[in-house]
Amino acid sequence: MMKNETSNFQIGRFLIEQRSFIALIILIAIVSMINPDFFSVDNILNILRQTSVNAIIAVGMTFVILIAGIDLSVGSVLALTGAIAASMVSIELPIFLVIPVVLLIGTLLGGISGVIVAKGKVQAFIATLVTMTLLRGITMVYTDGRPITTGFSDNADLFASIGTGYVLGIPVPIWIMSIVFAVAWYILKDTPIGRYIYALGGNEAATQLSGINVNKIKVFVFAVSGFLSALAGLIVTSRLSSAQPTAGVSYELDAIAAVVVGGTSLMGGKGRVMGTLIGALIIGFLNNALNLLDISSYYQMIAKALVILVAVLADNYLGTKKL
């Protein structure tokens, strides 16, 4: 009897902990039966490429949410850094200069949000709402509300390869996404800073009493979010060969959705970056499946909202349930 109870406990625990992965497998299986073209190699690579931008932003969002924060400015950081990248490429500045400069700017912009939260004692929602609006306004001023094209030089072609190129038959954005997740997984799992992030999200007061500088951790996670938003901005701009002043609008919602669907708690202290990858894939596969089934984008918004709702309810009622 005791053995059966233990077995049931382990099965239940597995189903709860792996619910996002199980949901992804079920989604793929159902849509593959409805439309055999869904599981073709070309379509899978296309989904992964389309998902890469949201997935990369969602990694930064995971860091922030793990400390019970939120970053609403990611889309605005993407837009501004993308515009800066496009203008630098258009005057034929070398790519090896453009990339680090843009990533540094993104890191600094994210760090500013972190400083406002840490030093100004402002709630992350309010702080990043301010920076989101401010940076969007700066982007509009910088671009004069018009797209900035990268031009037609060899330099522009090289830059475009970031978003459209292939390495070993796999799109470059997928490689970038894979590297980002691998590095993030290592940081959160095997480094002191990763342990501090989980500790801060679990209990800020106790973390501070243990001698950990919580303000530095807060600035760090927002800087990471800014860095990855800028990286996503490079991919989007290079793919389109232009920077749109409205780029990144509502990207913060997709990123939050990926994190929540992936099982990271909005209360902080609990979650995995690989869960975020699964969450981003669920969103990406769902969007692609609905497109293949020729379902209106209006219904796609409803479907995405329902998926997020189910994920939040699962976190509230399953993730915390004692089995």
UniProtKB/Swiss-Prot annotation:
Recorded hits in Pfam families, A to Z, give:
BPD_transp_2
Annotated membrane topology is: Multi-pass membrane protein
Recorded GO cellular component terms are: plasma membrane
Q: Which UniProt keywords apply?
A: Cell inner membrane, Cell membrane, Membrane, Sugar transport, Transmembrane, Transmembrane helix, Transport
Origin: domain of life: Bacteria
* Chain ranges passing through the membrane: 21-41, 55-75, 95-115, 122-142, 167-187, 217-237, 273-293
What is the annotated quaternary arrangement, including any partners?
Answer: The complex is composed of an ATP-binding protein (RbsA), two transmembrane proteins (RbsC) and a solute-binding protein (RbsB).
Read off the PANTHER family from this record.
ABC TRANSPORTER PERMEASE PROTEIN YPHD-RELATED, ABC TRANSPORTER PERMEASE PROTEIN YPHD-RELATED-RELATED
Protein name, please? Ribose import permease protein RbsC
Q: Which organism is it from?
A: Haemophilus influenzae (strain ATCC 51907 / DSM 11121 / KW20 / Rd)
| Record gene name | rbsC
